[in-house]
Design a protein with these regions (language model features):
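Short acidic, hydrophobic short linear motifs in intrinsically disordered regions
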Residues: 25-34
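Short alpha-helical segments that sit at the start of domains
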Residues: 1-16
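Residues within the helices of the helix-turn-helix
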Residues: 18, 29, 47
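Minor-groove-contacting beta-hairpin "wing" of winged helix-turn-helix DNA-binding domains
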Residues: 62-70
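A short, conserved structural fragment
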Residues: 50-60
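Short, locally clustered residues in the helix-turn-helix/winged-helix DNA-binding domain
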Residues: 18-22, 80
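Short amphipathic alpha-helical interaction segments
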Residues: 36-51
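Amphipathic alpha-helical dimerization/coiled-coil segments
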Residues: 1-2, 73-87
Length: 87
């Protein structure tokens, strides 16, 4: 497996990425509830994660659905090797 370059994540970014990876896919409202963060906080973290190419965001029927990108899944496996992904 190709090694990924070190990526700096804040605690909130890491929590959001971990939650998305555990769920396989989630919407902003579900993430907000699951993480006990406001929607604006979640949206801010998602913008940062998308800029780092760790998540993909798809707009459908007024909702934003988020998935971890391949790079994001690799990073989660590196950070939490014991975690079993949902996909």
């Amino acid at each position: 497996m190709k090694q990924i370059q070190p990526i700096a994540l804040t605690n909130d970014e890491a929590l959001v990425l971990q939650q998305i990876t555990e769920n396989g896919e989630d919407d902003v409202i579900g993430l907000s509830r699951g993480l006990s963060m406001s929607r604006s906080q979640v949206a801010k973290q998602l913008d940062r994660l998308r800029a780092k190419k760790l998540v993909t965001i798809k707009a459908t029927c007024g909702d934003l659905w988020v998935r971890a990108s391949k790079r994001g899944r690799q990073l989660v496996r590196y950070m939490w090797p014991e975690m079993a992904p949902a996909y």
